[in-house]
Amino acid sequence: MSILKIFAREIFDSRGNPTVEVDLYTSKGLFRAAVPSGASTGIYEALELRDNDKTRFLGKGVSKAVGHVNKTIAPALISKNINVVEQEKIDKLMLEMDGSENKSKFGANAILGVSLAVCKAGAAEKGVPLYRHIADLAGNPEVILPVPAFNVINGGSHAGNKLAMQEFMILPVGAESFKEAMRIGAEVYHNLKNVIKEKYGKDATNVGDEGGFAPNILEDKEALELLKTAISKAGYTDKVVIGMDVAASEFYRDGKYDLDFKSPDDPSRYITPDQLADLYKSFIKSYPLVSVEDPFDQDDWSAWKKFTATVGVQVVGDDLTVTNPKRIAKPVEEKSCNCLLLQVNQIGSVTESLQACKLAQSNGWGVMVSHRSGETEDTFIADLVVGLCTGQIKTGAPCRSERLAKYNQLLRIEEELGSKARFAGRNFRNPRIN
């Protein structure tokens, strides 16, 4: 069935910033999608169009992107009469109309809002759940429930503390099901809250953008120590492992790294890529650390390559790859990392997200589906991770409704699949091999 009407509006994300929401109507009803927004953004990401009118929302309005949907994209898609199940055809048309390399004409936030809504409408048109429609688009006969990576300690650009590294995550890989993984994650989270409260006081249990705690600690090792203690207190030492998102591009300075970048600048404390790599290796040795995201700057290629070759853990590219099939080719060739972070708004369309995922998987990489720090109540990525069979998702701590919206949707999907539900568990890096 073709599109009857498309209408975009400005709504608010979880940080109180405007973002784009799109309503798409077919004869089957209304399909709504909202677009997320990141805080630590890679320089190679598709352009998120903001108004830059300082008199309105401090320049962060998205009325231009909304206008592009309502005045240009909507009439074009309606007049073409394309069936909503033809995701690639519709996405291609929008990309051709935009015509720029990084979606700077309409904005990735405009194109993605429509693309997500089309995908939801396509599922309804076929009379199947969204995750099944996505699996069909990706050519996957089976679907898999992911291991959740809960970001329970926040630092970096997501928090007002001194921590340089951005996210410290727990992954309940030893769970038997997604439902059990949620319970384990929640129990560790509450134990962590008590550990932090006892050690640093009640103020230290305030939460950051993604629902994790942001205690005022300086040493990244201290964050890992807190996780180790909380996991042990919860009684899950054999079931929970640790992941990190360093977001090192945020503290890259003249070829070196500043682990105290929130203090006044002092080049004498900068460390070399090799010293930083040694720090990670010491973490891997002392803690159950199995995944490190963005350990180096997005252009520090040699450091990435060297590190990935010498550690046995998952090395995730985010700022390095920005979910862009064109940016993935080089790290695949150079073996710079071994896992893609998949964020739909970095590339700006469902079709290109699927292409990026397939390219990574076909080269033996893992894929981790991810939210952004500025989120909405939209649950698209929950269905996406199941349909793409990536086996892992990070969408914050088990706290704040915009995070739980995704986790709760995954619980519903597992329930709906019943006896057919498969949980990635310890095979989260390559869940197809069970």
Swiss-Prot record:
<dbReference type="InterPro" id="IPR029017">
    <property type="entry name" value="Enolase-like_N"/>
</dbReference>
<dbReference type="InterPro" id="IPR000941">
    <property type="entry name" value="Enolase"/>
</dbReference>
<comment type="subunit">
    <text>Homodimer.</text>
</comment>
<feature type="binding site">
    <location>
        <position position="40"/>
    </location>
    <ligand>
        <name>Mg(2+) 1</name>
    </ligand>
</feature>
<feature type="binding site">
    <location>
        <position position="158"/>
    </location>
    <ligand>
        <name>substrate</name>
    </ligand>
</feature>
<feature type="binding site">
    <location>
        <position position="293"/>
    </location>
    <ligand>
        <name>substrate</name>
    </ligand>
</feature>
<dbReference type="Pfam" id="PF03952">
    <property type="entry name" value="Enolase_N"/>
</dbReference>
<dbReference type="GO" id="GO:0004634">
    <property type="term" value="F:phosphopyruvate hydratase activity"/>
</dbReference>
<feature type="binding site">
    <location>
        <position position="167"/>
    </location>
    <ligand>
        <name>substrate</name>
    </ligand>
</feature>
<protein>
    <recommendedName>
        <fullName>Alpha-enolase</fullName>
        <ecNumber>4.2.1.11</ecNumber>
    </recommendedName>
</protein>
<comment type="similarity">
    <text>Belongs to the enolase family.</text>
</comment>
<dbReference type="InterPro" id="IPR020811">
    <property type="entry name" value="Enolase_N"/>
</dbReference>
<keyword id="KW-0324">Glycolysis</keyword>
<keyword id="KW-0460">Magnesium</keyword>
<feature type="binding site">
    <location>
        <position position="318"/>
    </location>
    <ligand>
        <name>Mg(2+) 2</name>
    </ligand>
</feature>
<feature type="binding site">
    <location>
        <position position="245"/>
    </location>
    <ligand>
        <name>Mg(2+) 2</name>
    </ligand>
</feature>
<dbReference type="GO" id="GO:0000015">
    <property type="term" value="C:phosphopyruvate hydratase complex"/>
</dbReference>
<feature type="binding site">
    <location>
        <position position="394"/>
    </location>
    <ligand>
        <name>substrate</name>
    </ligand>
</feature>
<dbReference type="InterPro" id="IPR036849">
    <property type="entry name" value="Enolase-like_C_sf"/>
</dbReference>
<feature type="binding site">
    <location>
        <begin position="370"/>
        <end position="373"/>
    </location>
    <ligand>
        <name>substrate</name>
    </ligand>
</feature>
<keyword id="KW-0456">Lyase</keyword>
<keyword id="KW-0479">Metal-binding</keyword>
<dbReference type="InterPro" id="IPR020809">
    <property type="entry name" value="Enolase_CS"/>
</dbReference>
<feature type="binding site">
    <location>
        <position position="318"/>
    </location>
    <ligand>
        <name>substrate</name>
    </ligand>
</feature>
<dbReference type="GO" id="GO:0006096">
    <property type="term" value="P:glycolytic process"/>
</dbReference>
<feature type="active site" description="Proton donor">
    <location>
        <position position="210"/>
    </location>
</feature>
<dbReference type="Pfam" id="PF00113">
    <property type="entry name" value="Enolase_C"/>
</dbReference>
<keyword id="KW-0963">Cytoplasm</keyword>
<feature type="binding site">
    <location>
        <position position="293"/>
    </location>
    <ligand>
        <name>Mg(2+) 2</name>
    </ligand>
</feature>
<dbReference type="InterPro" id="IPR020810">
    <property type="entry name" value="Enolase_C"/>
</dbReference>
<dbReference type="GO" id="GO:0000287">
    <property type="term" value="F:magnesium ion binding"/>
</dbReference>
<comment type="pathway">
    <text>Carbohydrate degradation; glycolysis; pyruvate from D-glyceraldehyde 3-phosphate: step 4/5.</text>
</comment>
